[in-house]
Curated annotation (Swiss-Prot):
Residues 65-164 are annotated as: Disordered. PANTHER family: TRANSFORMER-2 SEX-DETERMINING PROTEIN-RELATED. Keywords: Cytoplasm, Developmental protein, Methylation, Nucleus, RNA-binding, Stress response. Residues 155-164 have a biased composition (Basic and acidic residues). GO terms for molecular function: enzyme binding; mRNA 3'-UTR binding; mRNA binding; ribosome binding. Methylated on arginine residues within RGG motifs. Methylation by prmt1 promotes cytoplasmic accumulation. Cold-inducible mRNA binding protein. Acts cooperatively with elavl1/elrA to stabilize AU-rich element (ARE)-containing mRNAs by binding to them and inhibiting their deadenylation. Essential for embryonic gastrulation and neural development, acting to maintain the expression of a set of adhesion molecules, and cell movement during embryogenesis. Required for pronephros development. May play a role in hibernation. GO terms for biological process: cell migration; embryo development ending in birth or egg hatching; gastrulation; hibernation; mRNA stabilization; negative regulation of nuclear-transcribed mRNA poly(A) tail shortening; neurogenesis; positive regulation of translation. Interacts with prmt1. Interacts with elavl1/elrA (via RRM3). Associates with ribosomes. This is Cold-inducible RNA-binding protein.
């Protein structure tokens, strides 16, 4: 049975990278027990990360050293020991790398969030569409500072409309 250090996290994958590709790239470091590319449940599309588990811990360490920062399918990948975020001695390092991943995906959700509840909230007051989306996008997380500015934008727009 393999030890915990035999399982590697592989991040930054192209959405086109599959298990076969990862196995081909990592197999030169040793015998692989399992390869998993994590996919979205609904779309079945890659979420951009996966795991490679080696039979031998030393092979996994060699693969981590040899593959971290390399390019696979046009994307620079990150390779680290899986599950180390809960381990105190490497928690800071692991937290930093996963934090970058969260930042990337958070940006996508932020734009999606602006398109959902926020847009309809502004549509009722500002005439909606493009004008409603921009303030909602920028106000997410900073509602108080941008609330005044968007109100000012509406009063300017109202006075401009009165000329017509």
């Amino acid at each position: 049975m393999s030890c915990d250090e035999g399982k590697l996290f592989v991040g930054g994958l192209s959405f086109d990278t599959d298990e076969q590709c990862l196995e081909t790239v990592f197999s030169k470091y040793g015998q692989i027990q399992e390869v998993v590319v994590v996919k979205d449940r609904e779309t079945k599309r890659s979420r951009g990360f996966g795991f490679v588990t080696f039979e031998n811990c030393e092979d996994a360490k060699d693969a981590m050293a040899g593959m971290n920062g390399k390019t696979v399918d046009g994307r620079q990948i990150r390779v680290d020991q899986a599950g180390k975020s809960s381990n105190d001695r490497r928690g800071g390092y692991r937290g930093g790398s996963s934090g970058g991943g969260r930042g990337f995906f958070r940006g996508g959700r932020g734009r999606g969030g602006g398109g959902y509840g926020g847009s309809s909230r502004f549509d009722n007051r500002s005439g909606g569409g493009y004008g409603g989306w921009i303030p909602d996008y920028y106000s997410s997380g900073r509602e108080s500072s941008y609330g005044d500015r968007s109100a000012g934008g509406r009063s300017y727009r109202d006075s401009y409309d009165s000329y017509g």
